[in-house]
């Protein structure tokens, strides 16, 4: 269409649609709740655009009326998606679990850093249980839910790490103030750092409305400046004492994100954890083996070497340190399932090929089970390649195919044959495992 001759109302609708499009990704990725500032901001923008669309004069022309209708529908769709993201049952579940963590911190941790008793085993067990439950919240591959779960997990994991680090490595101090005039100042700073640790935890967990990340960062930086200004006169033990306190402050500073005060989780990234990196290394190699198998013209030549290497990868995963962290435990559990599923795929392929070589008379029911196993092998190959979420047509198709195989197995009558009964039971377990694996893959769990 010649833009110079385009009707002004159509041009205006296109401008509005462009503005609506500019916030679409923010809406899709919105991971907060309906009382968040960003929710209200996005809702306000979209509602304003709806009014703007409604005010466009169609002059009774059909093409303009249709264009206005389409623009309104797209804006309403985004408003609906924003509302659904904020009120999704699993988003509410994440928030409820987070509020449990807040109560735990309020009750057990804030008093501790205000001079109370030490952190209890009850707190450690409680926080681990909360993290574990969060790792099991299903996202269905939905971006907003994945973000919400990730942000909540990283905040709670940050608190866990701060506390464990503090309990594990208390500085070799305080030194006697008689040793040197600077010691009194270092002792004072150390007490301030302990208080700041409690403030930081309260900030991360949203239980302190009187402090900001920016202000706390300034306070901690000021404490480092005070320590740097001290004259320790070459005294090694005092210099070491000061260094330990500075290191403690720097550890706290890494959790503060000055660029986005509202999003403190960016400072804590579990993906940099040593155990997670080992798991990722194993998964990378597993994917390479999987791709080689699925793309090979004659995969049977790779079965033995691939299976041997995959079993070695299981051994490497067994050696991964869990560090009392449920996130790492969940990451390892998923990695073991990934590797084990590929081993099972090879085992079934080998069994099917062996059966072809040694064909013999068999019970009709047993033959029916083997036919289903052949189908399951083909479906499992597709599931291994699947990379989507539960709303994808391919997910639904694979789920239906697997359900059909389970129904086919249910229809098999073993007629009292024990061997057939055992084979059918094993085939049912395999089909259920493939379904579970498809579910796990579509969840797109993140660290």
From Swiss-Prot:
Location of the BAG domain: 9-86, 95-167, 182-260, 275-350, 365-442
Pfam families: BAG
GO-annotated molecular function: adenyl-nucleotide exchange factor activity; protein kinase binding; protein-folding chaperone binding; ubiquitin ligase inhibitor activity; ubiquitin protein ligase binding
Single GO biological process annotation from the record: negative regulation of protein refolding
Tissue distribution: Expressed in the heart.
Keywords from the UniProt entry: Cardiomyopathy, Chaperone, Disease variant, Repeat
GO CC list: cytoplasm; cytosol; inclusion body; junctional membrane complex; membrane; mitochondrion; nucleus; perinuclear region of cytoplasm
Superkingdom of this protein's organism: Eukaryota
SUPFAM superfamilies in the record: BAG domain
InterPro entries recorded: BAG_chaperone_regulator, BAG_dom_sf, BAG_domain
UniProt disease link: Cardiomyopathy, dilated, 2F: A form of dilated cardiomyopathy, a disorder characterized by ventricular dilation and impaired systolic function, resulting in congestive heart failure and arrhythmia. Patients are at risk of premature death. CMD2F is an autosomal recessive, early-onset form.
Domain notes: The fifth BAG domain is responsible for the interaction with HSP70 nucleotide-binding domain.
Assembly: Binds to the ATPase domain of HSP/HSP70 chaperones. Binds PRKN. Interacts with HSPA8 and JPH2.
Function: Co-chaperone for HSP/HSP70 proteins. It functions as a nucleotide-exchange factor promoting the release of ADP from HSP70, thereby activating HSP70-mediated protein refolding. Has an essential role in maintaining proteostasis at junctional membrane complexes (JMC), where it may function as a scaffold between the HSPA8 chaperone and JMC proteins enabling correct, HSPA8-dependent JMC protein folding. Inhibits both auto-ubiquitination of PRKN and ubiquitination of target proteins by PRKN.
UniProt name for this protein: BAG family molecular chaperone regulator 5
Organism lineage: Eukaryota, Metazoa, Chordata, Craniata, Vertebrata
Gene: BAG5
């Amino acid at each position: 269409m010649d833009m110079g001759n385009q009707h002004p109302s159509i041009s205006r609708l296109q401008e509005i649609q462009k503005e609506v499009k500019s916030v679409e990704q923010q809406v899709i990725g919105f991971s907060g709740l309906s009382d968040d500032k960003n929710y209200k901001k996005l809702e306000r923008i979209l509602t304003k655009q709806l009014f703007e669309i409604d005010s466009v004069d169609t002059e009774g022309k059909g093409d303009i009326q249709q264009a206005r209708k389409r623009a309104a529908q797209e804006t309403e769709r985004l408003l609906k998606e924003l509302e659904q993201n904020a009120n999704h049952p699993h988003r509410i579940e994440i928030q409820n679990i987070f509020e449990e963590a807040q109560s735990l911190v309020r009750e057990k941790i804030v008093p501790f850093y205000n001079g109370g008793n030490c952190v209890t085993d009850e707190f450690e067990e409680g926080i681990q249980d909360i993290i574990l439950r969060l790792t099991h919240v299903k996202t269905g591959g939905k971006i907003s839910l994945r973000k919400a779960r990730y942000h909540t997990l990283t905040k709670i994991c940050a608190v866990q790490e701060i506390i464990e680090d503090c309990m594990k490595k208390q500085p070799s101090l305080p030194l006697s103030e008689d040793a040197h005039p600077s010691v009194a100042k270092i002792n004072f700073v150390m007490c301030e750092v302990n208080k700041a640790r409690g403030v930081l935890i309260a900030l991360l967990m949203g239980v302190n409305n009187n402090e900001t990340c920016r202000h706390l960062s300034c306070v901690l930086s000021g404490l480092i400046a005070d320590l740097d200004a001290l004259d320790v006169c070459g005294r090694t033990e005092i210099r070491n004492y000061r260094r330990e306190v500075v290191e403690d402050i720097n550890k706290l500073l890494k959790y503060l994100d000055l660029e986005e005060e509202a999003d403190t989780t960016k400072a804590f990234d579990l993906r940099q954890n040593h155990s997670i990196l080992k798991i990722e290394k194993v998964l990378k190699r597993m994917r390479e083996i999987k791709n080689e198998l699925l793309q090979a013209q004659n995969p049977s030549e790779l079965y033995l070497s691939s299976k041997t290497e995959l079993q070695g990868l299981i051994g490497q995963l067994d050696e991964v340190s869990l560090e009392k962290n449920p996130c790492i435990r969940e990451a390892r559990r998923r990695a073991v399932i990934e590797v084990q599923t590929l081993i099972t795929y090879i085992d079934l392929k080998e069994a099917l090929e062996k059966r072809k070589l040694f064909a013999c008379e068999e019970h009709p029911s047993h033959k029916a089970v083997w036919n289903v196993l052949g189908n399951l092998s083909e479906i499992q190959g597709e599931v291994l390649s699947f990379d989507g979420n539960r709303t994808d047509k391919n997910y639904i198709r694979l789920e239906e195919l697997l359900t059909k195989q389970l129904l086919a197995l249910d229809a098999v009558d073993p007629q009292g044959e024990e061997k057939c009964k055992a084979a059918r039971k094993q085939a049912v377990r395999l089909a259920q495992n493939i379904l579970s694996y498809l579910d796990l893959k579509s969840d797109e769990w993140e660290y």
